[in-house]
Amino acid sequence: MKEFKVTTGPLPGSEKIYVEGERFPFLRVPMRRIRMSDTILENGEREKNEDVVVYDTSGPYTDTSYEVNLHRGVPKIREQWIEDRGDTVRLEGLSSEYGRIRQSDASLEKLRYEHVCTRPRAAKDGCATQLYYARQGIVTPEMEFVAIRENQLIDQVRTRYRAEEGEPLGAVIPRKITPEFVRDEIAAGRAILPANINHPESEPMIIGRNFLVKINANIGNSPISSTIEEEVEKAVWAIRWGADTVMDLSTGDHIHETREWIIRNSPVPIGTVPLYQTLEKVQGDVTKLNWEIFRDTLIEQAEQGVDYFTIHAGLRWHHVPLTLRRLTGIVSRGGSIIANWCTTHKRESFIYEHFEEICQILARYDVAISLGDGLRPGCIHDANDAAQIAELKTLGELTEIAWKYNVQTIIEGPGHVPMHKIRENMEIQLEACHGAPFYTLGPLVSDVASGYDHITSAIGAAQIGWFGTAMLCYVTQKEHLGLPNREDVREGVVTYRLAAHAADLAKGHPTAYWRDYMMSKARFEFRWKDQFHLSLDPEKAIQFHDATLPDEGHKEAHFCSMCGEHFCSMRANKNFRKLLNEEAVSK
């Protein structure tokens, strides 16, 4: 195996900081502080600007004091918290037959992560989930961690400014999020805190309508492209630019080993679609899929530390004929596999039939379930059709079953939906699925943007994020065309960070407005470096500016290359403001 190389170090103008807990003083919650320069007043005096603290998903990779060693993995920050709860036990060995086979295969030695845990954790009494704790009225360290993280020290801001209230459209956005608020949202099923007890490296985060909108980045090899090294680098690269979670959708060689490397080096929750690996185990023959192999795959991945599973349990046998009226049929990979199986065997899927047993497995490890939308529309023509809505209603029924077993649950959504149908989609989901968090792929608002689908989907993502979606699954410019590379991942993540931020602004999140306010102030005052550093992609902002004005002195100039020195509106504003102020003083 080649030597791993990942991108490390802070973003321009930023530094990693840690905030301690109050209830749990041992907590060290990571954030990114963007350093602001002084404002130069008309009289030449300097006025200090407050630094801006923002949410940070990058883990230890941007901490200059941390020595990166991918063969060792990132720190297991939750290990002691899990141990102290006393409700889990170390198993004598791997429970999955496939996991044991891979572990004993000497030919995989060079590919295998060196420090594989062969004694994973499981709940002593069958359940060790954050939902269970929340329902018992318990505030866990993970819950306080999340509360501190969501607030981004906004209560310490001293600058007086008029904050925009936003229009939350039914969401409840507190000025300050408390650990108790986090607990209550999880207990109500309106939010999840994905945190497998076998992924102690993960930094707690929350997905819910009443919190900051999150984004997911998909990575994964295919049978014809990519290596373990490339996928680990993609994961680290995605979180550097703001991915809150990462889904490993590998379908190629060494899925088990690739996933182990990713999890051990990931400070964010990792999701998978277990059905993909199950299909690989039967050499791609859908007819040979069965409950026993799928069950073993769930246990295998849960004991590795996967934090949430996409499971297409809501696609019923009688739903399949509804897709015959569609223009593009079933476009979900998981959905097409299940539909094929149901049609071949002329019965309900083994996933639907064994759903309660699935929940029992997930509760043992605190794996959240993302109920997959196997019948999501694959084109504008099919949006909000009978097949999509029928499955969504089934997902609502399954949500209640999952909650019965204290399994944290989110609902997956479309897809391709024109703008005028997006709000309706959100409203149907909220009612059918009892307020469980919605997790959508876009949606794409048009079908004609090949090569630009990150843009057409971000338009829909910003809207549905405002309407109530809790997490947005990114779409890259390679969507419908090919497997995304490293730069496609960056472009997709930053584009979706923008969509999520726009939704947060519309909903009235105070932290979102504060960052925009400080950007506008820096722009009006021609503090170019501060503008770069406050951007979602500082490196690209610097690159674009320097392409036409490369000299260091131009970063102090009161104009840019768009308008030039004599046509800059902000420069003109400053001039006539000065005149008006002088006139006011003279009067």
Swiss-Prot record:
* GO terms (BP aspect): thiamine biosynthetic process; thiamine diphosphate biosynthetic process
UniProt-listed Enzyme Commission number(s): 4.1.99.17
Q: Name the enzyme's class.
A: lyase
Keywords of the record: 4Fe-4S, Iron, Iron-sulfur, Lyase, Metal-binding, S-adenosyl-L-methionine, Thiamine biosynthesis, Zinc
Output the Gene3D superfamilies linked to this UniProt entry: 6.10.250.620, Radical SAM ThiC family, central domain
The residues the record assigns to binding Zn(2+) are: H416, H480
Q: Name one GO molecular function term.
A: carbon-carbon lyase activity
Residues that, per the record, bind [4Fe-4S] cluster: C560, C563, C568
Q: Extract the signal peptide range.
A: none
Cofactor(s) of this protein: [4Fe-4S] cluster
Q: Which reactions is this enzyme annotated as catalysing?
A: 5-amino-1-(5-phospho-beta-D-ribosyl)imidazole + S-adenosyl-L-methionine = 4-amino-2-methyl-5-(phosphooxymethyl)pyrimidine + CO + 5'-deoxyadenosine + formate + L-methionine + 3 H(+)
Q: Relay the cofactor remark from the entry.
A: Binds 1 [4Fe-4S] cluster per subunit. The cluster is coordinated with 3 cysteines and an exchangeable S-adenosyl-L-methionine.
Identify one Gene Ontology CC term for this UniProt entry: cytosol
Q: In which pathway does it act?
A: Cofactor biosynthesis; thiamine diphosphate biosynthesis
Instruction: Name the InterPro entries on file.
Output: ThiC, ThiC-associated_dom, ThiC/Bza_core_dom, ThiC/BzaA/B
Q: What does this protein do?
A: Catalyzes the synthesis of the hydroxymethylpyrimidine phosphate (HMP-P) moiety of thiamine from aminoimidazole ribotide (AIR) in a radical S-adenosyl-L-methionine (SAM)-dependent reaction.
What protein family does this chain belong to?
Belongs to the ThiC family.
Q: What is this protein called?
A: Phosphomethylpyrimidine synthase
User: Which species is listed as the source?
Assistant: Porphyromonas gingivalis (strain ATCC BAA-308 / W83)
